[in-house]
């Protein structure tokens, strides 16, 4: 088995390429028809297995997905592929949690995070759609982030942030939050990026923790 080059994130060995899932779970970011085409192609457990098998045979043994979404067939395919090849696949979960500032919302968030741990996730990176609700650009902070990273640590996972907004990386580094890694959009076309390519490249280069780039191809 050929091994893809590796690095270390939060004390865990990861391949320098990750398995992405937008084009297996139905998020093309281009059109509704493209989304539907993807969902039709990957509508069974068996449909996922050749993709997982190919990656794993080349040493790419980590996959990123919002496993709280429409991904039950994918999870089953992951378990079957692990059994077939005798190698574990590292789960990088990006759940969407309720970040409202009240006791009920915190209970819901904790339950979602605990579900992620029960699924076997090693990393839990809050999805950008909820994490970015906490950003205060005026103060340069991510409000109440420590509440959620503690929940993640208490559940036995490694905390991180999924970001479309590059300020999440900057503010997290500046404030020393308990965050071991980031996700950030980066590609040479600027596709779905919120600020200039050069600015994001500089932010990634100077980040204090490893950055997993998405939508690169």
Residue ranges and their predicted role:
Residues 20-24, 94-97, 125-130:
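Short loop/turn segments at strand-loop or loop-helix junctions that form parts
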Residues 64-65, 93, 126, 160-162:
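General beta-strand structural signal in soluble alpha/beta enzymes
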Residues 36-56, 102-117, 164-171:
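Short, acidic/polar
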Residues 53-57, 75-88, 110-121, 173-176, ...:
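Acidic (Asp/Glu)-rich catalytic clusters
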Residues 14-17, 59-62, 83-91, 120-122, ...:
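Short, well-ordered coil/turn segments that N-cap beta-strands
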Residues 68-69, 87-105:
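Structural motif corresponding to the early beta-alpha repeats
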Residues 1-83:
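N-terminal binding-site loop/beta-alpha segment at the start of enzyme catalytic domains
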Residues 97-107, 122, 129-217:
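Beta/alpha (TIM)-barrel catalytic core signal, keyed to glycine-rich beta->alpha loops juxtaposed to Asp/Glu
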């Amino acid at each position: 088995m050929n091994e893809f080059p590796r690095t270390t994130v939060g004390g865990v060995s990861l391949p320098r390429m990750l398995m992405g899932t937008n084009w297996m779970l139905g998020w093309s970011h281009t059109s509704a028809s493209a989304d539907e085409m993807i969902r039709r192609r990957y509508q069974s457990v068996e449909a996922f297995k050749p993709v997982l098998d190919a990656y794993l045979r080349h040493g790419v043994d980590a996959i990123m997905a919002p496993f709280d979404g429409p991904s039950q067939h994918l999870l089953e395919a992951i378990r079957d592929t692990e059994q077939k090849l005798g190698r574990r696949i590292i789960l990088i979960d990006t759940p969407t949690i309720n970040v409202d500032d009240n006791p009920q919302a915190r209970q819901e968030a904790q339950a979602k995070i605990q579900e992620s741990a029960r699924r076997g996730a090693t990393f839990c990176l809050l999805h950008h759609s909820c994490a970015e609700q906490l950003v205060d650009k005026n103060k340069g902070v991510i409000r109440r982030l420590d509440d959620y990273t503690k929940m993640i640590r208490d559940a036995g996972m490694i905390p991180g942030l999924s970001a479309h907004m590059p300020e999440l990386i900057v503010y997290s580094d500046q404030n020393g939050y308990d965050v071991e890694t980031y996700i950030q959009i980066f590609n040479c076309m600027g596709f779905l990026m919120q600020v200039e390519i050069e600015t994001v490249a500089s932010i990634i280069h100077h980040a204090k923790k490893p950055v997993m780039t998405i939508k690169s191809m």
